[in-house]
């Protein structure tokens, strides 16, 4: 409940040109279905949660 | 010393009975452990004993014995420390955490119960010195006071609970009109729509707005619901962790959680019975805010 430190552990996107490289790996996918599947896989592996930035991009955030 | 034996025994008995009355295993499931029970009953016995012998010590002008009462208080602070430590250790493995303020409140309760027992034994012995029956009556009166006057306030005293709709606007999860969080996965959104329940807690006055804004109090509500009604949750599923958010404008609290039991009448009954933590009680209304 206290203020936690949050970190982006991965970025999944259909529009790689809108994401600049940084600390987190960027996964490039082709369609909505692959976007959902990849996000889900990474979410489960990292025990983190997926959040929607926009229709094309999801980020995986670990706390 | 023979003259005081009976009063002391009555004092110890009533003190010990008081401790047993206060030690109940309720839905919060603590203290359920047999070892925990033994610890508290023996501490209760010791404090009843200390309380009971205080009066004869005063009557005999044995002042050294009286000062030992002060020493006993230090011992009971240990009870608080012990409770706090064991509850904190357990809390790290809890799916929905109790939170440090809740634990502090429970530890405090355990300490104060020992003082209550000591006080009960003391008063009972004092009465019993005059006559056996006055002692018994005094003891029973103390038991009634201890049992019924020492329970704290509940959430229903300071706020109203009502059911609220869970809905998504795109990726954003709302409980009624209060924003909870952003959910990225279609699958998680489906689970939430199916399993989650929303509740809005509306404070009754200015004091309760401040009390409810306390994060510890909000975590206590979530823990309470999760222990009694279960939760649809596992470790490593941060997307499903129950959350509370506050409407900063009017102080309403939105609760988002995934209980196993979704009947809202039960949920309301459980939420109404959430204890108000001592550390959460704020009374800004009592403060002098005038420009003098």
Task: Describe the residue ranges of each PLM region.
Chain A
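Short, compact, well-ordered microdomains
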Residues: 46-63
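N-terminal non-globular leader segments, chiefly Sec-dependent signal peptides
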Residues: 1-48
């Amino acid at each position: 409940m206290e203020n936690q430190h949050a970190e982006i552990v991965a970025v999944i996107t259909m529009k790689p040109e809108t994401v600049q490289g940084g600390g987190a790996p960027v996964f490039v996918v082709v369609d909505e279905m692959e976007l959902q599947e990849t996000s889900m896989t990474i979410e489960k592996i990292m025990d983190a949660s997926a959040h929607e930035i926009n229709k094309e991009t999801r980020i995986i955030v670990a706390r | 010393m023979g003259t005081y034996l009976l009063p002391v025994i009555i004092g110890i008995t009533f003190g010990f009975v008081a401790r047993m009355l206060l030690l109940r295993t309720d839905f919060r499931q603590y203290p359920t452990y047999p070892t925990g029970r033994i610890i508290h009953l023996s501490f209760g016995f010791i404090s009843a004993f200390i309380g009971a012998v205080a009066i004869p010590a005063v009557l005999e002008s044995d002042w050294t014995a009286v000062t030992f009462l002060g020493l006993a208080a230090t011992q009971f602070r240990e009870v608080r420390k012990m409770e706090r430590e064991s509850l904190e250790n357990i809390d790290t493995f809890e799916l929905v955490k109790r939170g440090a303020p809740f634990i502090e409140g429970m530890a405090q309760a355990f300490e104060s119960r020992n003082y209550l027992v000591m006080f009960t034994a003391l008063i009972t012995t004092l009465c019993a010195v005059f006559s056996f029956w006055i002692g018994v009556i005094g003891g029973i009166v103390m038991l009634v006071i201890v049992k019924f006057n020492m329970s704290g306030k509940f959430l229903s005293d300071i706020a109203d609970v009502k059911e609220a709709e869970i809905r998504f606007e795109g990726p954003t999860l709302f409980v009624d009109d209060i924003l909870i969080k952003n959910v990225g996965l279609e699958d998680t959104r489906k689970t939430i729509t199916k399993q989650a329940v929303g509740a809005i807690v509306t404070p009754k006055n200015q004091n309760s707005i401040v009390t409810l804004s306390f994060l510890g109090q909000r975590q206590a509500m979530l823990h309470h619901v999760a222990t009694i009604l279960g939760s649809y949750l596992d470790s490593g599923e941060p997307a499903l962790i129950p959350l509370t958010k506050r409407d900063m404008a009017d102080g309403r609290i939105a609760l988002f959680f995934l209980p196993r039991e979704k009947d809202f009448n039960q949920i309301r009954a459980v939420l109404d019975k959430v204890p108000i933590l001592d550390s959460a009680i704020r009374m800004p209304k009592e403060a002098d805010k005038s420009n003098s």
